[in-house]
From Swiss-Prot:
Alphabetical list of InterPro entries matching this protein: ZIP, Zn/Fe_permease_fun/pln
GO molecular function, one term: zinc ion transmembrane transporter activity
Organism of origin: Arabidopsis thaliana
Cytoplasmic side: 22-30, 94-188, 243-251, 313-323
Keywords from the UniProt entry: Cell membrane, Ion transport, Membrane, Transmembrane, Transmembrane helix, Transport, Zinc, Zinc transport
GO CC annotations on file: plasma membrane
Name the UniProt record assigns to this protein: Zinc transporter 9
Family note: Belongs to the ZIP transporter (TC 2.A.5) family.
Subcellular location, record wording: Cell membrane
Induction: In shoots and roots by zinc starvation.
Length: 344
């Protein structure tokens, strides 16, 4: 159990630590492609095949389990539900971040106008026609102008940005690529959360299966294979969490939660080993359904949110070297994870 815990923790930690180091951009793209291949192979080769094996077991009754391809059906349902959850969660985060950004821009715009507009005196605009009457500058009108302008009082903004902790580069970027940056950040957060949900459910099943096993001849090779299995899955998940750029506490919690799920499953399996029958109808159905659902989640995430998002991007299409490296790492990750199915 310790080897699985260490392997999972090491795998998920490497990408998180890598974000703190000045690594080559091509290497990072290769690592992302490798992780996508690992997740794709996990869904197809490990989870879907495991679900099919459990739900086609001879111990299950003929009706309804032999009358319909339930593993593939559950995987399809999971993929469609993941699409729906993906859409809803992304929309929630986008609305939340856009609201916070608008509030920040309005507040920032008002302060910039106070500092940089020569017609302002102590935060007020003197109206010559009204004989010196004072009018407060309209915050919303200025903010709207602020959103659609790429340059506005550089000296005043730089002075303000230093005091407010907003860098000039970040501000300029939000104007030029605000929607793209917002969407990209939200997508990475959603992907990391849904991906962990799919991986964790599978890890618990693996742990319980290992915990209820009584044969040392079976456990030893399985333990080694599962250690590599957890390492590769952790590496893939860690890469997605690193891209989400969560707070250090949030990243650590996701990594910790992944690392302990399989050992917890092992502990549960060991505790119920005396009364657990892995060939009972309830156990086979639970294992088959959960594996099939997890397969649908991971296949969707791998193809839609990881492979399509990167391999169909503009950056990939204009750089042949990056294309070659990414495809090689994608096939390598899928191949290595698939090979583990020989033992686990």
């Amino acid at each position: 159990m310790a080897s699985i815990l260490i392997s999972g923790a090491a795998g998920v930690s490497i990408p998180l630590v890598g974000t703190l180091l000045p690594l080559n951009g091509g290497l990072m793209r290769g690592a992302k492609a490798f992780a996508a291949g690992v997740i794709l192979a996990t869904g197809f080769v490990h989870m879907l095949s495991g679900g099919s094996k459990a739900l086609s077991d001879p111990c299950l009754p003929e009706f309804p389990w032999k009358m319909f391809p339930f593993p593939e059906f559950f995987a399809m349902v999971a993929a469609l539900l993941t699409l729906l959850a993906d859409f809803m969660i992304t929309g929630y985060y986008e609305r939340k971040q856009e609201k916070m950004m608008n509030q920040s821009v309005e507040s920032l715009g008002t302060q910039v106008s106070v500092m940089s507009d020569p017609g302002l005196e102590s935060g007020f605009l003197r109206d010559q026609e009204d004989g010196g009457a004072l009018h407060i500058v309209g915050m919303r009108a200025h903010a709207e102008h602020h959103r659609h302008s790429l340059s506005m009082g550089a000296e005043g903004f730089e002075a303000l940005s230093k005091r407010s902790g907003v860098s000039g580069h970040g501000h300029g970027h939000s104007h030029g690529h605000g929607d793209v940056g917002l969407d990209s950040g939200v997508r990475h957060v959603v992907v990391s959360q849904i991906l962990e949900m799919g991986i964790v459910s599978h890890s618990i099943i693996i742990g319980i299966s290992l915990g209820v096993s009584h044969s040392p001849c079976t456990i030893r090779p399985l333990l080694l294979a599962l250690s590599f299995h957890q390492f590769f899955e952790g590496f893939a998940l860690g890469g997605c969490v690193a891209e989400a750029r969560l707070t250090p506490r949030g990243s650590a919690m996701m990594a910790f939660f992944f690392a302990i799920t399989t050992p917890i499953g092992v502990a549960v399996g060991t505790a119920i080993a005396s009364s657990y029958n892995s060939y009972s109808v309830a156990a086979l159905v639970a294992e088959g359904v959960l594996d099939s659902l997890s397969a649908g989640i991971l296949v969707y995430m791998a193809l839609v949110d990881l492979i399509a998002a990167d391999f169909l991007s503009k950056k990939m299409s204009v750089d042949f070297r990056v294309q070659v490296v990414s495809y090689c790492f994608l096939f390598l990750g899928a191949g290595m994870m698939s090979a583990l199915a020989i033992w686990a």
